[in-house]
Regions:
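Sec-dependent signal peptide recognition
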Residues: 2-10
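Beta-sandwich interaction modules
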Residues: 111, 115-152, 257-280
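Extended extracellular/luminal ectodomain segments enriched in beta-structured repeat modules
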Residues: 47-49, 58-65, 213-219
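Extracellular beta-rich ligand/substrate-recognition surface
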Residues: 38-49, 195-201
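Acidic Ser/Thr/Pro-rich low-complexity disordered segments
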Residues: 97-121, 243-260
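C-terminal edge strands of extracellular/lumenal beta-sandwich accessory domains
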Residues: 20-31, 52, 80-83, 88-98, ...
């Protein structure tokens, strides 16, 4: 009970900014990424499927919408592999077991990962109408989500899958109160258990993701796929200034383990993705984190407890 109350307080504090693009501003990630299922995994997508969860606070009782930016695969943003031949399907789920089903919180599209009740779906191929534009799912009634006591809110899920072709789809989401504009829901948040995304084509830009460290976490295993030796992944927290983790090569996974410090419990890590020089362009990567029990850890787009800042003393090395 104490754990649930603590998480709830942190959720309230963290979502006061109300900004709900996915990826969020603090993450500085250009696009989510999903390839068609005929693509080579060396393009950076390990399983051609990505799930995100939206948390609607219990106080909110009005219709809402899930908007998708550039939902088609074709045009300026998406990644071409020969000719555009890719079809992607977006599916929105609510109802019982949409989040509480264990398979829904796993990192691979296996078992009952499409748990819950299908509320809406739409397939997109190359379509200039939606290139650099928005498609809106909804309206949805908050009561259609799964109520989760720990969050004091209702959960919805959206899955994007590449069901045909071999091109890369770059896209974003926005949780909105308006079908035609991006208007945030106060107190809402979004999270995922695996992040598949496009890195910036600019080595001055640093991307971030923020896994939350729950009570009882002793150690974490950080896994990344197809990093392509594109610089460094650095972990920042309230108790550590920066710890580099192992990075993967092309079409490979790399794992690294990190012992959790007492001060880090109930806060978020800041995983910083620092690009290499010379510039590696169009790099797509996949990241997930598990605790010592093998359970997946959530990445909140609005970090729980806020963006972590190192609280210790900064060491200065004098210049001779």
């Amino acid at each position: 009970m104490v754990k649930q109350i603590y998480i709830l307080i942190l959720l309230v504090v963290s979502t006061l900014a109300y900004t709900q693009p996915v990826p969020n501003v603090e993450e500085n990630i250009p696009y989510l990424m999903t390839f068609g299922h005929m693509a080579e995994t060396s393009w950076g997508d390990d399983d051609f499927s990505q799930a995100f969860f939206f948390l609607i606070p219990q106080e909110y009782d009005q219709p809402f919408f899930i908007r998708v930016f550039d939902p088609d695969t074709g045009g300026a943003i998406d990644e071409l592999a020969g000719e555009f031949n890719t079809r992607q399907v977006y599916e929105v789920y609510g109802g019982e077991s949409v989040w509480t089903e264990v398979d829904a919180r796993e990192t691979s599209p296996l078992g009952n990962y499409k748990s819950g009740t299908l509320l809406a779906s739409r397939a997109f191929a190359e379509n200039p109408r939606y290139d650099n534009g928005w498609y809106t799912f909804g309206p949805f009634n908050p009561a259609q989500g799964e109520y989760v006591e720990m969050f004091k809110g209702r959960i919805f899920k959206i899955i994007c899958e590449g069901v045909a072709g071999d091109d890369g789809n770059m896209y974003r989401y926005y949780l909105s109160t308006d079908a035609d504009a991006n208007r945030p829901i106060e107190g809402a948040n979004a999270f995922a258990y695996e992040y598949s995304f496009r890195m910036h084509n600019d080595y001055e830009e640093v991307a971030h993701i923020y896994p939350y460290v729950e009570d009882g976490t002793i150690s974490v295993k950080i896994s990344n796929f197809d990093w392509d030796v594109d610089g460094n992944i650095v972990v920042i927290s309230v108790a550590r200034q920066g710890r580099e983790v192992k990075v993967s090569g092309e079409d490979l996974w790399a794992d690294d383990e990190l012992r959790v410090l007492d001060e880090e419990i109930g806060t978020s890590f800041d995983f910083r993705f620092v690009k290499a020089r010379p510039l590696v362009k169009n790099n797509n990567v996949v990241v997930n984190v598990r605790n010592q029990r093998g359970e997946t850890m959530p990445f909140y787009t609005i970090p729980i407890g806020g963006v972590p800042k190192y609280r210790g003393e900064v060491e200065f090395v004098p210049i001779d």
